[in-house]
Structures are given as C-alpha cells and as structure tokens.
Amino acid sequence: MSRECELTGTKPMVGNIVSHSQIKTKRRYLPNLVQVTLRSEALDQNFRMRIAAKALRTVDKLGGLDAFLAKAKEEGLSTKALKIKRDIAKKAVA
C-alpha cells in the first residue's frame, strides 16, 4: 500500500530539519492519509478510498464525490478514481 492520495495524488515530500546551529538533517513529510468510504449519488454506490485529509475537506466543500471528480484533472487520480469518474460521466450522458 503506497502512501499516496487516490484523489489528489499527494505523495511524501523530502525536506530538511534545520537545527539552531544550522545542521541540516533529511526527513520525510508524509501526507495525512485516512481510509474513508465515499458515496457516489450518480452511481448509487459506496467506494472505499485512502485519501488525504485535505482532499476529504475539498470533497465536502464541493458537495460530494461526484462533484469533486467532475472538476478533477485526470493526471492526479488513481486508476480506481479514473474508473469511477468515467462511470459517472457515462451515467450522466445516458
């Protein structure tokens, strides 16, 4: 299981801890990932995903998974999220 958000593609970043004496030590900044179940109103299904807490706030702000995926660019999404996005688009056309 990778440490990557399925909706935004947020991954761990690398940086430095800098002490008072300016000694730099490498460290990793991990995304705040949470396991959540999101509901798609268009597909009438629940989806279990591992997403960043920031992405969860954005999903709530935009009004749900369907609205988030409609606005989201495809390059940050996981294969699972891409499939859900395409299924929602097909359902909207039909």
From Swiss-Prot:
UniProt keyword RNA-binding, yes or no: no
Family assignment from sequence similarity: Belongs to the bacterial ribosomal protein bL28 family.
Name of the gene encoding the protein in the UniProt record: rpmB
Gene3D superfamilies: Ribosomal protein L28/L24 (2.30.170.40)
Superkingdom of source: Bacteria
Record-linked SUPFAM superfamilies: L28p-like (SSF143800)
UniProt GO BP: translation
Gene Ontology molecular function, alphabetical: structural constituent of ribosome
The entry's keywords: Ribonucleoprotein, Ribosomal protein
Originating organism: Hyphomonas neptunium (strain ATCC 15444)
Family matches, as Pfam families: Ribosomal_L28 (PF00830)
A GO cellular-component term linked to this record: cytosolic large ribosomal subunit
Protein name: Large ribosomal subunit protein bL28
